[in-house]
């Protein structure tokens, strides 16, 4: 009976659900009450660990009952999870981790634990006795009751009260201890916060001295580390760290070992079973903070990872695997195409009414400044975080921030910014600043126009019209800000950017000679800080450039640009990128590949989708030539997409996976690649992939996602991170395709009972294609997650931190594993159920990707506890999909494939 229960697929399903729901609840507990509460109630609690243990037993029992060991690939990746759980258990129960702080010229032979302890020292007789009790205060019941023997009556210690308050990513609060010895009773309060320092108190209970301490426990090491020097490198002209290194000496007298090593991010020191990681440093840059761990489970865990990766990849190649069998069926059931025609028309634009002078100036500036502006954009500028880039890149970011466009009134970003810099008074009268909401337009006095002039924001007394409203909106938590408040704060930011352009403070164009940090100066700073004949020539050239643009004698400014460029290369050549990188970045900016790809993907996706539906009703219209044409168009768009990613990677110096914008570009790319390689025989799958690519690109260019190219922080400079992010985000593309295919199938369920055309077979084919997509997605998601474990362990010594993003990724694995194993339960109406779950399962991916970033506080998050309001379109889309699911339900029966084993 027990064996039957353990080897049941129903047990497996329940375990997946319980583990996923428990982890999901824990992420919200952590957001509201802190990490310690989430760990105490879920992750570290016996009930959750017991579920993981039962899951391991369930896997072993299922493997034995189904004789899965006969199929080597499937056996390898299933048994790998058991090995990984075993390694995790060894690390959790036998491992140790802590923090070591060393100042330059000093040494340390002990470390502090990451978890807090209550330390009780009893002074009796000749030697005091110290007891350690782990005590981490959480939002729920905290228990501590101890009875310690003394020479007379026992000392009783109890925790009687506690309170915590969430503050950003941390918590603060207090707890009260009550001590009883003989007839003496004392109550003592300790504060609880993120500080690692030890809190100490000495109490007397009659003749018994008791020393209490709360904080990390100090653990001695059999060797010592001394810090010879700490080195911090920053990005040019910036305070942002590029790399920090600890030069240490290790001495072990017992083994007669003395060696010198360097520790920096992603480069560790291993000795005596301990591994040291560079974590942080003192603000005066004279001390280092290292984390260390002792991990007896590492070899077992890495063995599990190796088996997992080998098994999953082998499974994709194994001709007997579910993946290859389905792929074979899809090829046999190839669908043809129908080509509908469609006409596109350009959008018209209108000019605002302006004064005769301003209209004349703008018209002349548009025509006459093109050559000068092009050279202006080719100057080098030091941007945020010290990134060196063509001025054209910064100009484009400025114009996009101000107007939401990459060009304005027929002028390039370089022309606009040069005009604002050289003739601020004229440009303060140009309606350039975007204002979305009607109440704000009315407050400024521009309604019904949606663009405001700089001058519109000030009344006749030069008072800022938005001052009070901005102050009010700034004090509101994000969850209480409506569209008006959000637009208000964004417009205020745009106005400040415009002001900085007019003042020239954004443009760090001039290298400061002999500066150790390679700092560059803006226009105003250069006047006061650059001296000598060269500086005088430079100032004259700058004045000539601005005067020539102001007087509209643009040819005069060409020589001035050459003088400025010569000075840049002479004084700042050490940090200026190569000519090939600069030209590549200018080409990348000029092509605007991703904004142009967005409508192309969407239009092509809808054309293919219309063709797929048309084929169901007019099969004779199918054409091999049309199918090939669609595929060729898909490959052309994919090639352009690939070119854009390669250019961005080249100019940034790192893989384009470092932020939300870049990862969305990559997700859409991976979805297209999967469709072109695996789904070329299905129009529905091809259209789903193309639409998914277009929607992700569209999302990447929404106003709250920043496309700016930036330098990497030190911890992100890792091969394992690049591999982890690229693989895991690629999986999102396949899950997105699965969600689209699920929605298409549900739509066909609704249509099948109202049309004469039989749709049962196409629905079943869609389910098979969908399953292939989800298998690919889950394979990549699992591999990507465990590659992330390798990166985290090699970077700071912890595979898994139960951070909300990690946790929701783990939840996604559980949910999609459940969806793909659902057929083993042989449910009725399997195709409907599978389509439904593949659609709604994508919600876990969206939560992993967007929800955690903006609604939960964590290491991967942009939120700090106050969530942003959920956009109305999310509710509308959810309602529409819910209606689709409900309307399809009465039509869920198919004639030939009701069981999941079909």
Swiss-Prot record:
Gene Ontology CC terms: membrane; plasma membrane
TM region positions: 9-29, 75-95, 300-320, 335-355, 602-622, 659-679, 731-751, 772-792, 832-852, 868-888
Keywords, alphabetical: Cell membrane, Cytochrome c-type biogenesis, Membrane, Transmembrane, Transmembrane helix
Topology of this chain in the membrane: Multi-pass membrane protein
Localization per record: Cell membrane
GO terms under biological process: cytochrome complex assembly; protein maturation
Single GO molecular function: heme binding
Keyword Transmembrane helix attributed: yes
Pfam families cross-referenced by the UniProt entry: Cytochrom_C_asm, ResB
The keyword Transport is annotated on this UniProt entry: no
Entry function: May play a role in cytochrome c biogenesis and may be required for maturation of the NrfA protein.
Family designation: In the C-terminal section; belongs to the CcmF/CycK/Ccl1/NrfE/CcsA family.
Identification of the protein by name: Protein NrfI
């Amino acid at each position: 009976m027990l064996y039957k229960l353990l080897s049941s697929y129903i047990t497996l399903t329940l375990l997946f659900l319980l583990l996923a729901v428990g982890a999901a609840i824990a992420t919200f507990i952590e957001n509201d009450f802190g990490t310690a509460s989430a760990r105490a109630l879920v992750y570290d609690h016996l009930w959750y660990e017991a579920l993981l243990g039962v899951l391991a037993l369930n896997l072993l029992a299922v493997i034995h009952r189904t004789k899965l060991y006969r199929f080597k690939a499937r056996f390898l990746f299933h048994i790998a999870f058991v090995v990984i759980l075993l390694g995790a258990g060894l690390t959790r129960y036998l491992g140790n981790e802590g923090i070591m702080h060393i100042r330059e010229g000093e040494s340390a032979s002990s470390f502090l634990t990451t978890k807090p302890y209550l330390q009780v020292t009893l002074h009796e007789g000749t030697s005091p006795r110290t007891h350690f009790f782990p005590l981490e205060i959480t939002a729920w019941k905290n228990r501590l009751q101890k009875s310690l023997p003394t020479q007379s009556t026992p000392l009783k210690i109890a925790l009687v009260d506690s309170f915590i308050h969430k503050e950003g990513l941390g918590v603060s609060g207090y707890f009260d201890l009550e001590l009883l010895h003989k007839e003496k009773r004392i109550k003592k309060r300790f504060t609880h916060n993120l500080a690692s320092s030890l809190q100490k108190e000495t109490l007397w209970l009659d003749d018994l001295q008791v020393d209490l301490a709360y904080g990390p426990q100090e653990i001695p090491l059999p060797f010592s580390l001394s810090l010879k020097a700490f080195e911090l490198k920053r990005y040019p002209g910036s305070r942002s760290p590029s790399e920090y290194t600890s030069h240490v000496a290790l001495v072990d007298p017992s083994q007669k070992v003395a060696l010198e090593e360097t520790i920096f991010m992603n480069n560790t020191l291993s000795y005596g079973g301990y591994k040291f990681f560079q974590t942080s440093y003192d603000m005066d840059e004279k001390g280092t903070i290292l984390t260390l761990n002792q991990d007896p489970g590492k070899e077992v865990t890495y063995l599990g990872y190796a088996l997992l990766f080998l098994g999953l990849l082998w499974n994709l190649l194994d001709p007997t695997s579910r993946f290859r069998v389905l792929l074979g069926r899809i090829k046999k059931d190839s669908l043809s195409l129908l080509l509908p025609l469609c006409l596109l028309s350009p959008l018209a634009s209108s000019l605002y009414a302006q004064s005769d002078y301003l209209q004349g100036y703008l018209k002349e500036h548009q025509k006459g400044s093109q050559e000068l502006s092009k050279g202006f954009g080719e100057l080098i500028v030091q941007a945020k975080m010290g990134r060196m880039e063509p001025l054209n890149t910064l100009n484009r970011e400025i114009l996009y921030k101000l107007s939401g466009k990459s060009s304005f009134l027929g002028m390039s970003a370089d022309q606009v910014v040069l005009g604002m810099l050289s003739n601020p008074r004229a440009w303060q009268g140009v309606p350039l600043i975007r204002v979305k909401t009607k109440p704000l337009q009315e407050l400024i006095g521009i309604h019904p126009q949606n663009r405001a002039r700089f001058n519109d924001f000030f009344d006749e007394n030069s008072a800022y019209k938005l001052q009070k409203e901005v102050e009010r909106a700034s004090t509101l938590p994000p969850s209480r800000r409506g569209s008006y408040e959000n637009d208000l704060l964004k417009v205020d930011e745009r106005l400040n950017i415009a002001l900085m352009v007019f003042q020239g403070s954004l443009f760090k164009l001039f290298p400061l000679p002999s500066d150790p940090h390679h700092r560059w100066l803006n226009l105003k700073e250069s006047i006061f800080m650059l001296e000598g004949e060269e500086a005088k020539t430079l100032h004259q050239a700058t004045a000539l450039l601005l005067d020539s643009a102001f007087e509209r004698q643009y040819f005069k400014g060409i020589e001035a640009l050459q003088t400025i460029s010569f000075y840049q290369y002479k004084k700042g050549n050490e940090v200026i990128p190569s000519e090939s990188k600069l030209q590549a970045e200018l080409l990348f900016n000029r092509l605007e590949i991703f904004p142009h790809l967005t409508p192309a993907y969407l239009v092509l996706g809808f054309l293919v989708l219309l063709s797929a539906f048309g084929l169901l009703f007019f099969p004779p219209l199918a054409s091999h030539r049309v199918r090939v044409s669609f595929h060729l168009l898909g490959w052309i768009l994919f090639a352009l997409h690939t070119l854009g990613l390669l250019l961005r990677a080249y100019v940034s110096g790192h893989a384009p996976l470092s932020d939300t914008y870049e990862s969305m570009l990559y997700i859409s790319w991976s979805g297209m690649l999967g469709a072109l390689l695996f789904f070329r025989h299905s129009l529905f799958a091809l259209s789903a992939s193309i639409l998914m690519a277009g929607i992700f690109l569209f999302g990447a260019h929404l106003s709250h996602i920043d496309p700016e190219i930036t330098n990497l922080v030190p911890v992100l400079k890792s091969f394992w991170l690049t591999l982890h992010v690229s693989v895991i985000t690629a999986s999102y593309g396949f899950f997105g395709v699965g969600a689209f295919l699920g929605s298409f199938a549900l739509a066909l369920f609704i249509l099948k009972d109202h049309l004469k055309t039989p749709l049962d077979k196409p629905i079943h084919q869609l389910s098979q294609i969908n399953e292939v997509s989800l298998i690919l997605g889950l394979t990549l998601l699992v591999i990507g997650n465990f590659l992330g474990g390798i990166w985290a362990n090699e970077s700071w010594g912890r595979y898994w931190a139960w951070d909300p993003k990690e946790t929701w990724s783990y939840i996604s694995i559980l949910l999609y594993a459940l969806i793909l194993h659902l057929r083993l339960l042989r449910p009725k109406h399997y195709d409907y159920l599978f389509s439904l779950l593949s659609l709604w399962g994508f919600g876990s991916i969206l939560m992993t990707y967007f929800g955690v970033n903006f609604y939960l506080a964590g290491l991967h998050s942009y939120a700090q506890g106050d969530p942003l309001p959920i956009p109305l379109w999310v509710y509308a889309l959810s309602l529409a999909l819910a209606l689709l699911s409900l309307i399809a339900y009465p039509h869920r029966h198919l004639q030939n494939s009701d069981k999941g084993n079909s």
